[in-house]
């Protein structure tokens, strides 16, 4: 499984990009929100690797919460990667959480390919959907954030650096975030 890519963007279109990693070029499908967030040549993407009988696809995300949202959506009945990426393109993760919590069928119907019945079913199946990290990872992120704040870094810098981190324990998160903040 490919869970992340770090490399150079060779071609960028609104719904996909080509990224070169170690001499190999990957086609990675992205949401419109991710496309808008990618503004540099060197990038790090969280990915979901989908292997089917007749195809293999990579879906990339700048924001880990968008990846979680996508991963949760593709587990639902009748929601494939195309519909899931359309939802990710239409709503940012926090907006989607609110839509699910409010059971807002009208908003979900705005997504291309989702009608009233599909919207209702998705909202019922998601139930109490939340994109927050698991308790362990979430507390590690909170502790790392507090540690970095105590070192005098701004919340915006910390948030941006932590979103790009792959570590799950506090000490590793702080180390990785410090390296990323230095590059900002």
UniProtKB/Swiss-Prot annotation:
GO terms for biological process: DNA recombination; DNA repair. Residues 134-135 are annotated as: Flexible linker. It holds the Pfam family RuvA_N. The keyword NADP does not apply. It is found in: Cytoplasm. CDD domains: UBA_RuvA_C. Residues 136-184 are annotated as: Domain III. Its main location: cytoplasm. InterPro entries: DNA_helicase_Holl-junc_RuvA_I, Hlx-hairpin-Hlx_DNA-bd_motif, NA-bd_OB-fold, RuvA, RuvA_2-like, RuvA_C, RuvA_C_sf. Keywords: Cytoplasm, DNA damage, DNA recombination, DNA repair, DNA-binding. Residues 1-62 are annotated as: Domain I. It comes from the Bacteria. One of its GO terms (molecular function) is four-way junction DNA binding. Residues 63-134 are annotated as: Domain II. GO terms for cellular component: cytoplasm; Holliday junction helicase complex; Holliday junction resolvase complex. HAMAP family: DNA_HJ_migration_RuvA (MF_00031). Homotetramer. Forms an RuvA(8)-RuvB(12)-Holliday junction (HJ) complex. HJ DNA is sandwiched between 2 RuvA tetramers; dsDNA enters through RuvA and exits via RuvB. An RuvB hexamer assembles on each DNA strand where it exits the tetramer. Each RuvB hexamer is contacted by two RuvA subunits (via domain III) on 2 adjacent RuvB subunits; this complex drives branch migration. In the full resolvosome a probable DNA-RuvA(4)-RuvB(12)-RuvC(2) complex forms which resolves the HJ. Has three domains with a flexible linker between the domains II and III and assumes an 'L' shape. Domain III is highly mobile and contacts RuvB. The RuvA-RuvB-RuvC complex processes Holliday junction (HJ) DNA during genetic recombination and DNA repair, while the RuvA-RuvB complex plays an important role in the rescue of blocked DNA replication forks via replication fork reversal (RFR). RuvA specifically binds to HJ cruciform DNA, conferring on it an open structure. The RuvB hexamer acts as an ATP-dependent pump, pulling dsDNA into and through the RuvAB complex. HJ branch migration allows RuvC to scan DNA until it finds its consensus sequence, where it cleaves and resolves the cruciform DNA. Belongs to the RuvA family. This is Holliday junction branch migration complex subunit RuvA. The gene is ruvA.
């Amino acid at each position: 499984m490919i869970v992340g890519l770090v490399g150079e963007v060779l071609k960028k279109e609104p719904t996909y990009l080509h990224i070169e990693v170690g001499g190999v070029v990957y086609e990675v499908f992205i949401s419109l929100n991710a496309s808008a967030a990618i503004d540099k040549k060197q990038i790090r993407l969280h990915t979901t690797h989908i292997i089917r009988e007749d195809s293999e696809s990579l879906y990339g995300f700048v924001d880990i919460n968008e990846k979680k949202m996508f991963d949760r959506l593709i587990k639902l009945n009748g929601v494939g990667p195309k519909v899931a990426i359309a939802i990710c393109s239409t709503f940012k993760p926090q907006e989607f959480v609110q839509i699910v919590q409010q059971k807002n069928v009208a908003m979900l119907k705005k997504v291309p390919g989702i009608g009233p019945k599909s919207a209702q079913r998705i909202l019922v199946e998601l139930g109490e959907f939340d994109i927050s990290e698991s308790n362990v990872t979430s507390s590690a992120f909170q502790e790392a954030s507090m540690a970095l704040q105590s070192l005098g870094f701004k919340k915006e810098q910390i948030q941006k650096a932590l979103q790009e981190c792959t570590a799950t324990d506090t000490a590793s998160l702080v180390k990785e975030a410090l390296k990323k903040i230095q590059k900002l």
